[in-house]
């Protein structure tokens, strides 16, 4: 499917420049290096190095806000970073909103919101070790 699972509207991988520009659209997480970690538009933490990694809960994809199937384009204004599970949940829905609190009871959404939390970082940028 063209424009699906993090590809452009022609089914090709996005360029490195586009990936970086879309990454910068994600919201920084206070106290954490924004080059490594940010939040997608739904508030779910994503990790820069996990772009396209659907085996990681921090994996993310480039989503077409308005899907190509509904007339959307590859223009940067129509692209957003989205945690991969949410991107699959969204599919070609348009308009689409992040799942609300009541929808978090759906198994696929609940798994995302309950299991995806930002890593614990100390002020020095080092991972905190739980004892």
Predicted regions and their residues:
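Short, charged surface segments at domain edges that flank catalytic/cofactor-binding sites
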Residues: 2-51
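Short, cysteine/histidine-rich loop/knuckle motifs that typically chelate Zn2+
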Residues: 85
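Flexible domain-boundary/linker segments
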Residues: 39, 82, 96-100
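Intrinsically disordered, low-complexity segments enriched in small/polar residues
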Residues: 1-4, 9, 41, 50, ...
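Histidine-centered nuclease catalytic patch
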Residues: 44-82, 92-94
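Polybasic, low-complexity binding patches
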Residues: 70-77, 88-131
């Amino acid at each position: 499917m063209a424009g699906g699972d993090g590809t452009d509207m022609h089914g090709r991988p996005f360029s490195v420049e586009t990936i970086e520009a879309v990454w910068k659209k994600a919201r920084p997480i206070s106290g954490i290096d924004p080059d490594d970690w940010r939040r997608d538009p739904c508030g779910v933490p994503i990790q820069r190095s996990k772009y396209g990694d659907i085996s990681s809960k921090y994996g993310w994809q480039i989503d077409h806000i308005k899907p190509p199937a509904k007339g959307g384009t590859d223009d940067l204004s129509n692209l957003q970073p989205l945690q991969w599970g949410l991107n699959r949940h969204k599919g070609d829905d348009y308009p689409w909103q992040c799942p609300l609190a009541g929808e978090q009871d759906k198994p696929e959404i609940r798994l995302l919101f309950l299991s995806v939390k930002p890593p614990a970082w100390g002020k020095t940028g080092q991972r905190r070790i739980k004892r």
